[in-house]
């Protein structure tokens, strides 16, 4: 969290050279509480614009306030909540910790009140982007605003490896690399690689059979009887189990006439 290091002399917002503005809202009020030694810049209510980038929240004050800009990186924020009171405007609150060389020390409770609306939209997007940043993902639309019409400006997109070096003269060091690691390597070590499918056996060859004999009514009846007694397994539809062939019945001899016996 840095104090007065993200604004230009012309009143624009300065973001890192690999970041861009994902979302912004005007008519926002910023207040601080729970500080042991309150610096002059943290006293009172600050009015201005809040900006969301892929890795931090930046508040830009209007007028000649002692706090011209205030930056909160996600990895130093905790206990963030979106509140919808019955009376009054919706707001976002949480706790932020100072970073080394940020212009102040300790921690503080902050409250961002959206007097003209937008707290829910901004808060939900902030939580989503913070979660993506913690996993090393690039948020959707991270490079959507190359220039802000209000005079604010952003720097070019990030380099190929996803990490962002500071531009010349940037007033504070980048966060430790463990907070925003690059995208994970997609190799076998991930544990989610599916095994290759089994080899395709190819089309089934027709069975080899001898020369077909002319069909007769007796042969067709016997084949129909064998098919009726076959067993079909739905789990193995390519095989049909046939009963073992039985010997033919003995020939039929009509009984002799008793008169001839």
UniProtKB/Swiss-Prot annotation:
GO annotation, biological process: cellular response to estrogen stimulus; establishment of protein localization to chromatin; positive regulation of intracellular estrogen receptor signaling pathway; positive regulation of transcription by RNA polymerase II; progesterone receptor signaling pathway; response to estrogen; response to progesterone; transcription initiation-coupled chromatin remodeling
A Pfam family hit: GRAM
Compartment annotation: Cytoplasm; Nucleus
Keyword terms, alphabetized: Cytoplasm, Nucleus, Phosphoprotein, Repeat
Gene Ontology annotations for the cellular component aspect, listed alphabetically: chromatin; cytoplasm; cytosol; nucleoplasm; nucleus
Motif position, PPxY motif 2: 248-252
Result of changing residue 200 to A: Abolishes interaction with NEDD4
Tissue: Expressed in the ear and the eye. Isoform 1 is expressed in brain, inner ear and organ of Corti. Isoform 2 is only detected in brain.
Ranges of compositional bias, category Pro residues: 196-209, 245-254
InterPro entries assigned: GRAM, WBP2-like
Biased composition (Low complexity): 210-230
Region annotation Disordered: where it falls in the sequence: 196-261
Consequence of gene disruption: Mutant animals have a progressive high-frequency hearing loss. They show swelling of afferent terminals and abnormal expression of AMPA receptor subunit at post-synaptic densities. Mice are fertile and show no other abnormalities.
GO terms for MF: chromatin DNA binding; nuclear estrogen receptor binding; RNA polymerase II cis-regulatory region sequence-specific DNA binding; transcription coactivator activity
Motif (PPxY motif 1): 196-200
Post-translational modification: Phosphorylated in repsonse to EGF as well as estrogen and progesterone hormones. Tyr-192 and Tyr-231 are phosphorylated by YES and SRC inducing nuclear translocation.
Phosphotyrosine: modified positions: 192, 231
Ranges where the GRAM domain occurs: 1-84
Function summary: Acts as a transcriptional coactivator of estrogen and progesterone receptors (ESR1 and PGR) upon hormone activation. In presence of estrogen, binds to ESR1-responsive promoters. Synergizes with YAP1 to enhance PGR activity. Modulates expression of post-synaptic scaffolding proteins via regulation of ESR1, ESR2 and PGR.
Assembly, per entry: Binds to the WW domain of YAP1, WWP1 and WWP2. Interacts with NEDD4. Interacts with ESR1 and UBE3A.
Domain notes from UniProt: The PPxY motif 1 mediates interaction with NEDD4. The PPxY motif 2 is required for the coactivation function.
Protein name per Swiss-Prot or TrEMBL: WW domain-binding protein 2
Record organism: Mus musculus (Mouse)
Lineage: Eukaryota, Metazoa, Chordata, Craniata, Vertebrata
